[in-house]
From Swiss-Prot:
Function: Dual-function protein that regulates the transcription of class 2 flagellar operons and that also acts as an export chaperone for the filament-capping protein FliD. As a transcriptional regulator, acts as an anti-FlhDC factor; it directly binds FlhC, thus inhibiting the binding of the FlhC/FlhD complex to class 2 promoters, resulting in decreased expression of class 2 flagellar operons. As a chaperone, effects FliD transition to the membrane by preventing its premature polymerization, and by directing it to the export apparatus.
Region FliD binding, annotated ranges: 60-98
InterPro entries named among the record's database cross-references: FliT
Keyword match Repeat: no
Family listed: Belongs to the FliT family.
Top-level taxonomy: Bacteria, Pseudomonadati, Pseudomonadota, Gammaproteobacteria, Enterobacterales
Domain of life: Bacteria
GO CC, one annotated term: cytosol
Species this protein is from: Yersinia pestis (strain Pestoides F)
Subcellular location, principal: cytoplasm
Name of protein: Flagellar protein FliT
Gene name per UniProt: fliT
């Protein structure tokens, strides 16, 4: 029974971490999200090793199934928010590239070039 409690506790830790990651993604705190992701991945790896040998009770399996469902829902939402951020960053990179092209083009003119509307 103690092993089952430990396993349930490990899954709860993963769920808590995924909820924290979802909150960080929602408020666009990307740096902290990336830092927390390493802790999350280690917790998942440790729990996977425990789960293989421990999951025999149907009641425990149902409890874990509920936690896994919530974890997966959080993962889906985090991925959606990350994709939105990636799209925004791609747009900004595109704008920057276009601006650099404009700057290179207009930078070819001599410093004394007349601006539109100026007289000599």
């Amino acid at each position: 029974m103690e092993r089952h409690q430990h396993l349930l506790s490990e899954y709860q830790q993963i769920l808590t971490l995924s909820e924290q990651m979802l909150m960080l993604a929602t408020v666009e705190n990307w740096n902290t999200l990336v830092d927390l992701e390493m802790t999350y991945l280690k917790a998942v790896e440790n729990t996977a090793n425990i789960t293989i040998s421990s999951c025999t009770s149907p009641v425990l399996q149902e409890l874990l199934r509920q936690k896994l469902r919530s974890i997966l829902e959080n993962e889906i939402e985090i991925k959606r928010l990350l994709q939105r951020r990636l799209d925004k960053l791609s747009e900004l990179v595109g704008q920057s590239t276009r601006q650099q092209a404009v700057n290179r083009t207009y930078g070819q003119f001599p410093d004394q070039a007349l601006l539109l509307g100026e007289t000599q």
